[in-house]
Swiss-Prot record:
Gene: eIF3-S6
Protein name in the entry: Eukaryotic translation initiation factor 3 subunit E
Highest taxon in the source lineage: Eukaryota
Keyword rRNA-binding: no
GO biological process, one term: formation of cytoplasmic translation initiation complex
Keywords carried by this UniProt record: Cytoplasm, Initiation factor, Protein biosynthesis
Length: 435
């Protein structure tokens, strides 16, 4: 299933520490050769200070469980450097502990002024705090790194040349500690900084592309993320432009968010337009599922793509947690679209369209009716589902009628074109044989 695997593309825009969970996930899926993947992880982790993780990978590669002299020396150097940086930063930590209510101060200038007045504070010590935070991060000690990064953000002015690096570091550390509420706050702060800073066009495009990939990790793990990903990726033009220019594969995650978010069906029309525009550069079973269903009205194609979607999602680190929701909502979308064209449906036909057994399909419809999500009746003797109608205002009736006629017209047009194309191919017309 490596054909649809996006790990290599996604990892290009992630910090190396953020790639480790993705690579470990791939190891479990057996999509690639295990030894080659472990060697790649070992090569990547060797660029950090994560000595214990390095040893773990070496053991899994059967390279022995004894610590090589090189790693022993490296661990010793890491501990010495860590002690040195902690000593440098100790005065700042003491000042911050004694400073009253730093969180309530208006801005970094107020905090720096208070520190200078009360503790003879030197701004250069912030550089040491940043180095220590970075060093702890490289050791895999993300929680302690967050503490120092938080202080850096309190004291640093946004004009500081290192401010952007600290914002990125804080977001990465919050993601790696699975602190999603704070990660979302940091994501918003970083996005505001990128959007309002004076970057060159190339720089801002690069920054937005990185932010798009990092934000997927946050959005699919935060309660509000499914709405926020649609707002940012589909309706913030600057980010949509970045997706279309640099990373159209992100459409997989946008499409997934729209499919599982029943309250945002109004976004489907805009999403499908983008998917069609970008289909020449990127497509996968998830984007093709929407095209089959809403562009071609190809229910058989949609059924087959839904089956492929399940395999894609199972092997995608970002969206594997959405699998059941995706299947449920995708089936509902097929059902709703099918019912707009056919008012009376056999359970057998419906089961076929939804990749379900007839008994399972009947039970599924019963649950929809029971949960007041569907106005329909089941005729068990005939094996039919008869769609009901709810009283509508004259205006709503007109809108529904036009909408329904539009859907039916498009479906009929597609069917006629498909049949005509088949006839043309059979007769050999239009092949320009004798040009």
């Amino acid at each position: 299933m490596s054909k649809f695997d996006l790990t290599a593309k996604n990892c290009q825009y992630l910090d190396r520490h953020l790639t480790f969970p993705l690579l470990e996930f791939l190891l479990q899926k057996n999509i690639y050769d295990q030894t080659s993947l472990l060697k790649f992880i070992l090569e990547t982790v060797s660029k950090t200070n994560m000595v214990d993780y390095t040893m773990d990978i070496r053991e899994r590669l059967n390279m022995g469980n004894e610590l090589p002299e090189e790693l022993t020396k490296r661990r010793s150097n890491v501990l010495v450097k860590l002690k040195e940086l902690q000593t440098e930063v100790a005065p700042l930590m003491k000042c911050m502990e004694e400073l009253k209510n730093p969180d309530t101060m208006k801005d970094s200038k107020s905090i720096v002024h208070a520190l200078q007045q009360e503790f003879d504070f030197k701004y250069d010590i912030i550089r040491s705090a940043q180095k220590l935070a970075k060093y702890l991060y490289e050791c895999g000690n993300y929680r302690d790194s967050i503490s120092y990064l938080y202080i850096c953000l309190l004291v640093m002015e946004p004009t500081d040349k290192n401010y952007l690096n600290v914002l990125w570091g804080k977001l990465a550390a919050e993601i790696l500690t699975l602190n999603w509420p704070t990660a979302l706050e940091d994501l918003t702060r970083l996005r505001d900084f990128i959007d309002n800073h004076n970057f060159s066009p190339i720089e801002v495009l690069q920054q937005r592309t990185w932010l798009i990939h990092w934000s997927v990790l946050v959005f699919f793990n935060h309660a509000k993320g499914r709405d926020l990903i649609i707002e940012m990726f589909l309706y913030k033009q600057l980010y949509l432009n970045a997706i279309q220019t640099m990373c159209p594969h992100i459409l997989r995650y946008l499409a997934t968010a729209v499919i599982i978010n029943r309250g945002r069906r109004n976004a489907l029309k805009d999403l499908i337009k983008i998917i069609q525009q970008e289909s020449y550069t990127y497509k996968d079973p998830i984007t093709e599922f929407l095209e089959c269903l809403y562009v071609n009205f190809d229910f058989e194609g949609a059924r087959m793509k839904l089956h492929e979607c399940q395999t894609v999602i199972i092997n995608d680190f970002f969206i594997i947690g959405c699998l059941q929701e995706f299947i449920e909502n995708a089936r509902l979308m097929i059902f709703e679209t099918f019912c707009r064209i056919h008012q009376c449906i056999t359970i057998g036909m419906l089961a076929d369209k939804l990749n379900m057994e007839p008994d399972e399909a009947e039970c599924w419809i019963v649950n929809l009716i029971r949960n007041a999500r569907l106005d329909a009746k089941i005729d068990s003797k005939l094996g039919h589902v008869v769609m009901g109608t709810q009283p509508l205002s004259p205006y709503q009736q007109l809108v529904e009628k036009i909408d329904s006629l539009s859907v039916r017209s498009e479906a009929l047009t597609v069917l006629v074109e498909r049949k005509q194309k088949a006839k043309t191919q059979e007769s050999g017309e239009g092949n320009w044989k004798y040009y």
